[in-house]
Regions:
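ATP-dependent carboxylate-amine ligase
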Residues: 1-17, 41-44, 49-52, 334-343, ...
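N-terminal leader/targeting and accessory segments in enzymes
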Residues: 1-93, 97, 316, 320, ...
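Short loop/helix-cap segments at secondary-structure boundaries that form the rim of catalytic
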Residues: 39, 59, 71-79, 147-149, ...
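Non-catalytic positions within long, well-ordered alpha-helices that form the structural scaffold/packing
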Residues: 60-61, 174, 196, 419
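Short, polar loop motifs at secondary-structure junctions
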Residues: 65-75, 140-143, 243-245, 267-271, ...
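Acidic, Mg2+-coordinating active-site environments of NTP-dependent enzymes
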Residues: 75-77, 202-369, 447-450
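Phosphate-binding loop of NTP-binding sites
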Residues: 91-242, 246-261, 391, 515
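Structural beta-sheet core signal
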Residues: 138, 183, 203, 240, ...
Length: 516
């Protein structure tokens, strides 16, 4: 891979990003990086994010051939300086060019929503693995899968990677023979222009509810919604859950750049929805069976364009939760738009396992433990409401915390969900506190709980101890809900990723010790 200065500057000019160039020479970059630790001879270096001038000095010392920034730095003296008005946009465009536009060789399904992105991504990944003979790549909150060999699978650091990493991984997927890609897209990816210029074949909008609002994230819900909607603006075909909040806004955003015949709407049968203009529900689904182990539903095409996909039928998923049926429907339709058949979905959906999503751990003497990534008001409420409907549990204990430095709106949201669903006991603990004091976060959550409705609340800042306390206090017919972290293998504390065994492993190991 390489990038010559002349087409690079032309590309920046085309997007009105280039301010000026200092010390211009004729060069070809043979690598690109925003991390000075990874710079080698011939690298085009990007000064991004939490940049410090010393990083540029280090990059220069290691052989950087030029740098891209929003201003010139003395530390880069003697190097060609490509000065732009938006470094993140420039990095995305030049990253795509350096890796020779791998997105053009992939059918890309992109998914956004406040909740359900990962579950939908895994459903679609399994369906398309069946229909493409495993020529499918996956970029999710949990994993980045670039091929079919063990060395092609990595743990994810971000829901949507930095642009250079994203295009690097796309290139690797294409070189590994992948023809399709399913990827989650976060609102932050648009807020920070990580995916500027990237287009999708199918864009899925699952839902929207207040989240990621506060310092270091989105200043308002309107800003959060706007960033989510950008996925539809950049998609050739749009698939929208018509039951989402702000549906009219979302629909009009899609319609502004997409022809009506390329917009597909789905909803649960009987849902109370006000449809704008001449919009029609294209697919409806009806729940036929739900329990703690699986869900079964019927999908019906209502419009001519929907009927052409031949996706009518009954489907069964191994991921419980009535709310996950909508995620499965989105995956079925999107996969159908990518060429998959109804049979591909029927054969695969009942075999999908997603780590840390409604993961159930049984015990002989301490009830049932559920591990779920529920990390905001909407997802926690839906999880607790579902478990309440599906079980005759004696006591329900919830273990949770809230992240520090971001997502401040989650704290009142947790208090509201707990008040409304009224578990018998709550243990407030640590969950990625960042630079905040976890006890302060826990007490803030507690301040939003109605103590007349939730009477038993404990504080235990060691999460492993909190989990063990919850299990110790539970009997045969009881339920323990470990919410918020799912399969996260670390705690973010004071700027470091501190290794953490994961909620699943801690609970399983402790149950095994107790029942030995």
């Amino acid at each position: 891979m390489e990038l010559h200065i002349t087409p690079a500057l032309a590309l920046l000019c085309e997007h009105h990003l280039l301010d000026h160039v200092s010390n211009l020479t004729d060069f070809t970059a043979t690598s690109v990086s925003y991390d000075s630790r990874k710079v080698k001879s011939g690298t085009l270096f990007f000064c991004k994010g939490n940049f410090l001038p010393k990083y540029l000095a280090s990059a220069k010392e290691k052989g950087a051939i030029a740098y891209v920034a929003e201003k010139e730095y003395p530390e880069g003296e003697g190097l060609p300086a490509i000065i732009v008005n938006d470094e993140q946009k420039a990095m995305s465009l030049l990253g795509a060019a350096f890796y020779d536009y791998p997105q053009n060789d992939l059918f890309i399904i992109a998914i956004t929503g406040t909740k359900g992105k990962t579950t939908t991504a895994y459903f679609a990944d399994h369906i398309l693995a069946q229909s493409t003979a495993n020529h499918i790549a996956l970029f999710s909150t949990l994993d980045r899968i670039l091929g079919n060999k063990p060395e092609d699978e990595f743990k994810s650091d971000l829901t949507t990677p930095e642009s250079l990493d994203l295009f690097h991984d796309m290139r690797a997927a294409v070189d590994n023979g992948m023809t399709h890609l399913v990827m989650e897209v976060s609102s932050q990816a648009y807020k920070k222009n990580r995916i500027y210029g990237l287009k999708y074949d199918v864009g899925i909008f699952l839902n929207i509810s207040p989240d990621h609002i506060g310092r270091n994230e989105h200043p308002t819900f309107a800003d959060y919604l706007h960033c989510k909607e950008q996925l539809l603006v950049n998609s050739a075909k749009c698939l929208i859950n018509a039951e989402t909040e702000k549906f009219t806004d979302v629909y009009y955003t899609a319609k502004a750049t997409t022809q009506p015949e390329d917009i597909f709407l789905f909803a649960r049968r009987g849902a109370n929805i006000e449809l704008p203009d001449n919009a029609q529900i294209d697919f409806e689904y009806r729940n036929d069976l739900e329990d703690l182990h699986e869900s079964e539903f019927e999908l019906t095409a209502l419009t001519e364009k929907a009927k052409q996909l031949n996706l009518d039928g009954r489907y069964k998923t191994s991921v419980p939760g009535d709310y996950n049926e909508g995620n499965a429907v989105a995956a079925i339709i999107a996969s159908g738009l990518a060429g998959a058949s109804a049979n591909d979905a029927v054969e695969t959906l009942n075999h999908v396992h997603i780590r840390g999503r409604m993961e159930m751990i049984n015990s002989n003497t301490h009830g049932t433990i559920y591990v779920d990534y529920a990390h905001n008001y909407a997802s926690l409420k839906r999880l607790l409401a579902f478990l309440k409907r599906q079980t005759n549990a004696g006591k329900v204990t919830v273990v949770l915390g809230a992240t520090g430095d971001k997502g401040i709106s989650r704290r009142p949201g947790f208090g509201k969900a707990l008040t409304e669903e009224q578990p018998d006991e709550v243990i407030l603990t640590t969950d990625d506190p960042g630079f905040e004091d976890p006890m302060t976060i826990a007490r803030e959550i507690d301040s939003y709980i109605d103590h007349d409705k939730v009477k038993h609340i404990q504080f235990e800042m060691d999460r492993e101890t909190a989990i063990k306390k919850a299990i110790d206090g539970s009997g045969n017919d009881d339920i323990v809900v470990l919410a918020g972290k799912g399969e996260d293998p670390y705690q973010k504390i004071n700027g470091e990723d501190v290794p953490y065994l994961t909620d699943v492993k801690i609970a399983r190991d402790y149950i095994n010790d107790l029942e030995r």
